[in-house]
A protein has these predicted regions:
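"A position-specific structural signal for the A-helix of alpha-solenoid helical repeats
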Residues: 16, 50, 83-87
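Short coil turns that delineate tetratricopeptide repeat
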Residues: 42, 76-77
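Secretory-pathway glycan-assembly enzymes, especially type II membrane glycosyltransferases
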Residues: 95-306, 310, 314
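A donor-sugar binding/catalytic signature common to diverse glycosyltransferases
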Residues: 121, 365-414
């Protein structure tokens, strides 16, 4: 554990960095770093003041006033800066834009399948917070389109039902204004349009608040954890934990195509009639991202051993993995108890979705089917810092009623971090 003095110094440096970001107009980065300081136990009033300043810039005086109260509680005496923030927060804001013709288009952010779904879930919450009709369109930048698909094909609807009745054709050719201004009627379904680099890149969520344009377009990820702080008090998900927010939004919007549900039920009827533990093992690019996973590998086997008595001693093991060496390891250890789907596997350090020789549509179907089947098992062991494991966990709780005793996630959660580094433009 870091010594207290070193931790305080680190937090002061983070607040200084966030203050500089705010001075450049990068208020979402500033707010995100301030949240990280507070999540680590930092007690700097300046962190709360940065949050208040951000809230005022996106027309959320309710959030600003709450942050100001926290800042004042940490100060020994009143500060002029805090008083100035309070005066601004108490100034009546201009009316919020209203009307039925307000849309939020959610593009792919061109990462892994469940990372893209994670992105969609967050932006669906943004649509609810901002009162916009959502439309998910995974266009030419999606890694999960069929190789033969061209033009305006929507890969999202290859896997899931539409999240609303709105179609791209209903939005275009009406003279509607767009934000960010890099978007227009003609380029909504194209490949990359500066999601990570260039003007109006790395726009995550807060820039969409209080916009007057009829159409907002998202092509960059915002962690659900960061978004939960901005849920209005009157919203059904206000103050709910991140896991509950995900599962609520999934129940409302995430509807896999009937063909996949039928296939998952058929597989379960054939292979999962006896007690089965689903085990999701990551390798390839996740090993590169997180480093040596050997310690986690040992914890997997401990978790399987702890779950086994609950299911008769020697349950079946459904191995869900993209990592070819894992199959050999599990078969050697557990023998014919192991069930493995036919999903594509690799021994390379490059994720399957980044390997150009593979067909994205097929990979998407495989990883979706793996998750749906795993969620039909009796228990689960996964890597918490993986969207695949995270969504299997949510699906299993919704499908099979798993609780923490039956769904073991190893390590810190991928949905428990703010990932402020994603917003850094330099």
């Amino acid at each position: 554990m870091m010594p207290l003095a070193a931790q305080d110094e680190r937090h002061a440096g983070m607040v200084a960095y966030a203050t500089d970001a705010m001075s450049r107009g990068e208020y979402e980065l500033a707010e995100r770093v301030a949240r990280e300081v507070l999540a680590e136990g930092g007690r700097l009033p300046e962190a709360w003041e940065l949050i208040a300043e951000t809230a005022l810039r996106v027309s959320r005086p309710d959030i600003a006033l709450g942050a100001i109260e926290m800042a004042e509680a940490l100060r020994a005496s009143p500060a002029p800066a805090t008083a100035a923030l309070r005066a601004r927060a108490l100034t009546p804001p201009k009316p919020s834009p209203a009307g039925n013709d307000r849309y939020h288009i959610i593009r792919s952010w061109a990462q892994g399948f469940w990372s893209d779904v994670d992105h969609v879930m967050g932006q669906l919450l943004v649509a609810e917070i901002t009162g916009r009709k959502p439309l998910v369109h995974w266009g030419a930048n999606s890694r999960f389109r069929d190789a033969t698909e061209t033009g305006d094909a929507n890969a999202w609807e290859s896997f899931f039902e539409p999240v609303s009745s709105v179609k791209i054709a209903e939005i275009t050719d009406r003279g509607l204004a767009y934000f960010p201004p890099k978007w227009n009627d003609a380029n909504l379904t194209i490949g990359d349009n500066g999601a990570f680099h260039g003007p109006h890149s790395r726009i995550a969520a807060l820039d969409f608040f209080a916009r007057e344009e009829a159409v907002t377009v998202s092509d960059f990820h915002a962690p659900m954890l960061a978004l939960t702080h901005w849920i209005p008090r009157e919203h059904r998900l206000h103050s709910k934990p991140v896991s509950r927010v995900f599962m609520d939004l999934m129940q409302k919007y995430l509807k896999p195509k009937r063909e996949f549900l039928t296939r998952a039920d058929t597989f379960a009827g054939k292979h999962l009639s006896k007690p089965t533990i689903a085990v999701h093992v990551r390798g390839s690019d996740k090993a590169k991202e997180l480093g040596d996973l050997s310690a986690a590998a040992a914890l997997y086997h401990q978790a399987i051993a702890s779950l086994s008595p609950l299911m008769g001693g020697k349950p079946k093991i459904l191995l869900v993995t993209d990592w070819a060496p894992a199959e050999a390891e599990y078969r050697a250890r557990y023998g014919d108890r192991v069930i493995v789907s036919g999903a594509t596997k690799t021994s390379l350090s490059t994720g399957l979705h980044f390997q150009p020789s593979l067909i994205g549509r097929n990979l998407g179907e495989e990883v979706l089917m793996d998750a749906l089947i795993a969620a039909r098992c009796h228990a689960f062991v996964g890597l918490a810092y993986s969207n695949v494991s995270a969504f299997i966990g949510y699906l299993g709780r919704l499908t099979k009623g798993w609780d923490d005793s039956r769904a073991i996630q190893i390590g810190p959660s991928i949905h428990g971090v703010y990932n402020s580094f994603l917003l850094k433009r330099s």
